[in-house]
Amino acid sequence: MLIPDIVKILTDSGIEPNEANVEVKLLIEHFAGYSLVDILMGKKLDEEKLKIVEEKAKLRAKTHQPIQHIIGFADFMGEKFVVNSDVLIPRDETEILVRKAIELIKNNNYKIALDMCTGSGCIA
């Protein structure tokens, strides 16, 4: 199976084409161990690893489980955080909020900031 075929699995399930492309690249990076550069340079992908990627894409298409839950982590402010169905996935908007909070803390010389019960702990 080729990468466009795996993308089609996701788009056929209703996932937007751009999102499907990004998600397949994430699956390839995580489950096959290839970087985005490897993919863009046309490096031949191992068939067995590609089969795992295909299985994970089918799981995503069937369950519509968030891609972060399938790969087991979410990126937040340049760091990776473990997530699963028991943890809220940090959103891009939260990064904006955290950047503003950091700015507020620095500008007002606050010594303590408190983050309680906000999910994955990425804000803390």
Feature locations, PLM:
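Non-catalytic accessory regions of SAM-dependent methyltransferases
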Residues: M1-V37, M41-L45
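A general structural signal for well-ordered alpha-helical segments in protein cores
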Residues: I3, V24, V53-E54, I67, ...
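Conserved AdoMet
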Residues: E29-L104
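Conserved SAM/SAH cofactor-binding pocket of Class I
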Residues: E93-A124
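A generic helix-loop boundary/linker signal
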Residues: P17-N18, E47, N84, A113
